[in-house]
Amino acid sequence: MASPSKGSDLFSSDEEGPAALAGPGPGPGGAEGAAEERRVKVSSLPFSVEALMSDKKPPKGASPRPADSASAGAALRPLLLPGHGAREAPSPGPPGKPFEAASVKSESAEDGAAWMQEPGRYSPPPRHMSPTTCTLRKHKTNRKPRTPFTTSQLLALERKFRQKQYLSIAERAEFSSSLNLTETQVKIWFQNRRAKAKRLQEAELEKLKMAAKPMLPSGFSLPFPINSPLQAASIYGASYPFHRPVLPIPPVGLYATPVGYGMYHLS
């Protein structure tokens, strides 16, 4: 027969067995310990609010898992909506002032990284250049309007200009009174007509020079002017008593002999 002390020991051991296997019950001390352990784990993440505020680098040995880092980066990455600016996605964390400071800091860092990585996506809007205004030459305010000459007046002025380009004071006064014009109008018309005649004369001289220019092959030039009488006399010989007209010299390739010896013979 067992003693009472031994029986009590067996009874106590039987009650402690299931309790030891089940573990500590959900008491107030156990809940606080689990919450404290979870908070420590969250604060150890490099992307947590506490880590961003303290700017502490994680140890070299402990590197976060790829899934945790990817989820944390996606939580802090700003949302890009068409037509709106960058908005930060709500990230889990304890509310309060520390969360606001951390959100501002992460937003500035992520915005800078996004601008550096994708410059084409965040290009500034094109500038709308205003059309360049063409500045016209402004005439004088006191400028007199042009005189509308009639056909009969223009014919009389042209006829008088062909007779005499410069009119005296008496001739101008008489001529202007016959055309019902002022002396100033007649004077200005004659000045403009003389300038026009000079321009036409210069243009005609330029055309004559271009027509009289000899047709020489490209790359061929003479060391002397063709129209010079002294050089022409040296070509044809000094014994000629008169100057012969100078003809255009044909290209050198047509004759085997030197220039000038194919058509003319020296005396």
Curated annotation (Swiss-Prot):
Ranges of Low complexity composition bias in the record: 69-84
GO cellular component terms given for this protein: cytosol; nuclear speck; nucleus
InterPro entries referenced in this protein's UniProt entry, alphabetically: HD, HD_metazoa, Homeobox_CS, Homeodomain-like_sf, Msh_Homeobox_Regulators
Subcellular location: Nucleus
Bias kind Basic residues: ranges: 136-146
Region: Disordered, residue numbers: 1-147
Gene Ontology biological process terms in this record: embryonic morphogenesis; negative regulation of DNA-templated transcription; negative regulation of transcription by RNA polymerase II; osteoblast differentiation; regulation of transcription by RNA polymerase II
Pfam families: Homeodomain
Alphabetized UniProt keyword annotations: Developmental protein, DNA-binding, Homeobox, Nucleus, Osteogenesis, Repressor, Transcription, Transcription regulation
UniProt DNA-binding residue ranges: 142-201
MF GO annotations: DNA-binding transcription factor activity, RNA polymerase II-specific; RNA polymerase II transcription regulatory region sequence-specific DNA binding; transcription cis-regulatory region binding
Domain of life: Eukaryota
Keyword DNA-binding: yes
Assembly and interaction partners: Interacts with MINT, with XRCC6 (Ku70) and XRCC5 (Ku80).
Primary role: Acts as a transcriptional regulator in bone development. Represses the ALPL promoter activity and antagonizes the stimulatory effect of DLX5 on ALPL expression during osteoblast differentiation. Probable morphogenetic role. May play a role in limb-pattern formation. In osteoblasts, suppresses transcription driven by the osteocalcin FGF response element (OCFRE). Binds to the homeodomain-response element of the ALPL promoter.
Family the entry assigns: Belongs to the Msh homeobox family.
PANTHER family in the cross-refs: HOMEOBOX PROTEIN MSX, HOMEOBOX PROTEIN MSX-2
Protein name per the record: Homeobox protein MSX-2
Native source organism of the sequence: Canis lupus familiaris (Dog)
